Amino acid sequence: MSEVPEELKIKQKFPNWYDWLKPITQKDIKHGFASYIALPKQVNSEFFKMPFGDVERDVFSEDWKLPENWKEIILDSFKETLEKNRAFKVFMDICVRCGACADKCHYYIGTGDPKNMPVMRAETVRSVYRYYFTIGGKLFGKWAGARPLDENVIKEWYYYLLQCSLCRRCSLFCPYGIDTAEVVWWARRMLSRVGLNQRFMCISIEASARTGNHLGLYAGGMAGSIEQGLSELKDITGFDLHTYINKPGADVLFVAPSADYFATPHWYAMLGYLLLFNELEERYGLTVTWSTYASEGGNFGTFHSYEAAQLLNSKIYKEAERLGVKFIIGGECGHMWRDKHQFINTMNNPPKHAEWKKFWDDPDLGQISEKLKGINLGEFISGEHGWIHVLEFVAALIKHKKIDIDPSRNDHWRATYHDPCNVARGMGMLEEPRYVLRNVMNNFYDMPEHTIREKTYCCAAGGGMLAEELMELRMRGVMPRMMALRYVVKKYGVNIMLTPCAIDKAQFPIAVDYWKIPVEIGGPMEMVGNALVLTAFGEKPEDRKYDLRGTPIREEE
């Protein structure tokens, strides 16, 4: 792992508008802030092939080995985007550079670099738009905020467009509703047309295209991980539990982020899923299957390009149709929910098989079990037709009193909740996680209001920023969230921060260690698993002695 900086020094800089028109040069590209460029094995493979991906490039080299006609390719891609994407065209034209977004970006707060203001990040692209696609820019040049493309401008694009986690907090405060994340996404696509792809996200995209998940796990590895989870749960609960993998005719397809199969603390959410699904089958006959083909809920294509996103999320609907399931439950993954909430049904056609259509004509769980009658998923889903988030699903079960809960099993935890950007701002799921947590535990405390729900601060590792070479940027960008966390730790004695996002769970353990905040990191489904009483198996509330981490639930008397 890259070393994190010993001390963060933040110097705020506010140049005039003409100064920022000068692009950076190679000497301005710094370690800790620059993303490595993808290697041919990631972008020139049988499963994921990008233009000019057969060349190895070095972000710290003077020569980035751009194709000879790179400028023509970029401008053609720019023109295509303007013609096909109305929002992108509008966002190019309507910004008045008021600066309302400037101090809303965690990267600008943490770095003090003015080109990390959302307005200026977008201006790196907008200035080129003005020069080539507007009359004012063609006539007045820099006096109209326009500049021509050259290699330094392209390097600046790559450097700063990959210092954005696409969290969209800036768009919340923009009086015109400009979505800078969308500007960045389409500009990254333009860069990919000349061979400039970020290495970290392309490793995951290629692996997912090849194996079905970001980790590159094949069927045996995934199945073995789940079997290990069942073995651990027997030690904790005393019951022989089971699960289904690739089961035709199951009621539900469950899709988790692949980090849940191996990483910590993600693993404890995995155990929570398995407990819930066993209780529901034993009690109500509802069957849930995993898939080794569609074994990844996340989609790093949503950080890269439309085409990459479409390629990866196509697998899930294909598998839902092949297995004949009635609906899909998604696990604790952040960007999965922007993808499934806003993109999947326009990128790929939903399943058309009879079981799916019949269920969604009237999505009442009574179709599966008479004992579940009255739980209409249409009242709980906030995402695309056919999908429900696992926390929305648990909220429905709790509201209708279909599972038994003992919140005292979590009394050794004092929790706060981090809203993942793509779950909160991306799909509007704000209250369901809090409803679940307040039911499964007795000690829950929110962070300050201006740092949560739709105003949540980013973990600073999404959008491809989880790359190890960006460690300094990550530790700077996570500062606002860490300050809010430190507040509730001091005020309420919080000892765990919960988040339903795999990238959060990878970033925050490093961040709390760096910022010296003594808390654990986990997911809401871990707390659900702790509190869930396996009534169908004969378990009583007082029977469970250990939580899913193997920690004693109650102090020895």
From Swiss-Prot:
Membrane topology type: Peripheral membrane protein
Keyword Transport in annotation: yes
Pfam families on file: CCG, Fer4_8
Localization terms from the record: Membrane
GO molecular function, one term: 4 iron, 4 sulfur cluster binding
Co-factor: note: Binds 2 [4Fe-4S] clusters per subunit.
Domain 4Fe-4S ferredoxin-type, first and last residues per copy: 86-115, 155-184
Signal peptide as annotated in the record: none
Cofactors demanded by this protein: [4Fe-4S] cluster
Binding site for [4Fe-4S] cluster 1: 95, 98, 101, 174
Keyword Nucleotidyltransferase on entry: no
Positions contributing to [4Fe-4S] cluster 2 binding: 105, 164, 167, 170
UniProt xrefs under InterPro entries: 4Fe4S_Fe-S-bd, 4Fe4S_Fe_S_CS, Cys_rich_dom, Helical_ferredxn
Keyword list, A-Z: 4Fe-4S, Electron transport, Iron, Iron-sulfur, Membrane, Metal-binding, Oxidoreductase, Repeat, Transport
Free-text function comment from the UniProt entry: Has menaquinol-oxidizing activity. The HmeC and HmeD subunits may together mediate electron transfer from menaquinol to an unidentified electron acceptor on the cytoplasmic side of the membrane.
Name assigned to this protein: Hdr-like menaquinol oxidoreductase iron-sulfur subunit
Species name: Archaeoglobus profundus (strain DSM 5631 / JCM 9629 / NBRC 100127 / Av18)
